[in-house]
């Protein structure tokens, strides 16, 4: 384990979650913990990737983690010692970064912050801090249609930080992006997550490289084979990788590390079998 790196208590616990839709088993006894990560002398959060091929049930798991849907059985606990997840406990960033088009940037943030239950003055201070950090103070009176794609992303993420300062859940944030845009989104996710040691960003995606390049932990979802090699319906956790413990958590130049490429190849080889 790298010097100065240690693992703390579970901050998200997924316990035996199962879900059926239309008679089809989508998730089956799915369990994993997301553990707090501590780095000596560093103030930084963590990024966790939930990886799986298309159609494996990632969207349904996303909604359960966000408290938007309930599983048929099992539970999701948030924080330490752990409380059942409820809508609003986790900030949710949808795939296409939806905003209130008829409201200004400032109003978008303040409407989102109203769900936090914090006093007006605290919400205004938080919104100003976010706009300053995202270099958008001069856009606070603009409408979403006047923003670039990258600026919209920042405001959509800012909305969710206004709601939940600790947990951020992102659905396929890299989908359909070219290399330049993908790099910008990765940089933004790193910036938001590492701004505070309590922050945890969970990325649900099928993009192996984009997730592993910035993740501290990766959970691989898939369907377990039976004794004849036939897939049993319902996604489970097939593997979990602690990239921090492996010395492969995000750092400058990680993509040039041969061990990092071996990890990518291992995951890529498993994907078709999931």
Locations of the language-model features?
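The feature captures the beta-strand-to-loop junction immediately N-terminal to the Walker
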Residues: 51-53
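Helix-to-loop junction immediately C-terminal to a conserved catalytic motif
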Residues: 66
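Short coil-to-helix segment of the ABC ATPase nucleotide-binding domain corresponding to the Q-loop/switch region
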Residues: 103-110
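Conserved ABC ATPase "signature" region
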Residues: 110, 121-139, 189-191
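Conserved signature/switch motifs of ABC ATPase nucleotide-binding domains
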Residues: 142, 163
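Conserved ABC ATPase signature
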Residues: 143-147, 151
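Catalytic Walker B motif of ABC-type/P-loop ATPase nucleotide-binding domains
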Residues: 168-172
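Helical segment within the ABC ATPase nucleotide-binding domain
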Residues: 182-197
